[in-house]
Design a protein with these regions (language model features):
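Hydrophobic ligand-binding cavity/cleft-lining segments
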Residues: 1-61, 169-207
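Beta-strand secondary-structure signal
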Residues: 9-11, 59, 81, 95-97, ...
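Short, intrinsically disordered, mixed-charge
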Residues: 26-34, 77, 87, 103, ...
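Hydrophobic-ligand binding "helix-grip"
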Residues: 61-102, 202, 206
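Secondary-structure transition/turn motif
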Residues: 62-64, 85-87, 110-115, 173-175
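Short secondary-structure transition/capping segments
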Residues: 82-94, 152-164, 197
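Beta-strand/loop substructures that line and gate deep hydrophobic ligand-binding cavities in soluble
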Residues: 87-131
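A conserved amphipathic terminal alpha-helix motif
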Residues: 114-166, 170-174
Length: 207
């Protein structure tokens, strides 16, 4: 890739939700193809999955970048991690998380993204990032509507370039998720313990 690995986070706090964080996430998982905005068309290739299921490969038509394939490498009652399939231009991962924070349900999207080449970097700098941000905000707005509650404040967004050490931690985390999924198919007696479930860069700062 070209340039630093970037971490972007979008989140919304929901008050008065009809559903628990896990129930809301279950609805999001099943209705993923319906809740994503048109700018993130997950029906770009007919016949491909539109529901988040572990191991599923989903095709998303992302703004500016075109069709990108991502695989669901981790799926729990309140979290999903999608990792770019090798060979596609979006070199990174997407994490969705629904959790209880005090009296509100926080739903967040975390992106780990590195442009694949110079042309990709220039395009993202020119128009792609603002369109991408609006798309993730549109998804969170749809989730608020799905929850039956109301956002307590505008959708929040922050981003930062990760240094080399942080980038290595994230890349290791992604690789371990892939190994963990492969191990899950093995007998329990053969599975290693201790895989991290949270990106190391987020453990102290955001989760």
């Amino acid at each position: 890739g070209v340039g630093a690995l970037k971490r972007k986070r979008f989140w919304v706090d929901i008050a008065g939700a009809t559903f628990s964080p896990e129930e809301l996430f279950a609805r999001f998982r099943v209705r993923f193809g319906e809740l994503t905005p048109l700018t993130m068309n997950v029906r770009a290739e007919p016949g491909t999955p539109t529901m988040l299921e572990r191991g599923a490969t989903i095709t998303m038509a992302l703004p500016v970048r075109g069709n990108v394939q991502v695989r669901v490498e981790r799926l729990t009652a309140n979290e999903a991690v999608l990792v770019t399939v090798a060979g596609h231009p979006l070199a990174g991962a997407i994490r969705f998380l629904s959790e209880q924070i005090g009296d509100v349900v926080r739903f967040q999207v975390q992106l780990y993204d590195r442009p694949a080449n110079l042309a990709d970097w220039v395009m993202m700098r020119a128009v792609g990032e603002s369109v991408q941000a609006r798309s993730w905000e549109g998804l969170l707005e749809a989730i608020v509507a799905e929850s039956g509650g109301a956002a307590v404040s505008p959708i929040q967004h922050d981003e930062e370039n990760l240094d080399e050490r942080q980038a290595e931690l994230v890349e290791t985390w992604v690789k371990e998720l892939i190994v963990e999924k492969a191990r899950a198919a093995e007998p329990a007696s053969r599975r290693p313990e201790g895989f991290p479930v949270t990106p190391p860069t987020d453990q102290a700062s955001f989760s």
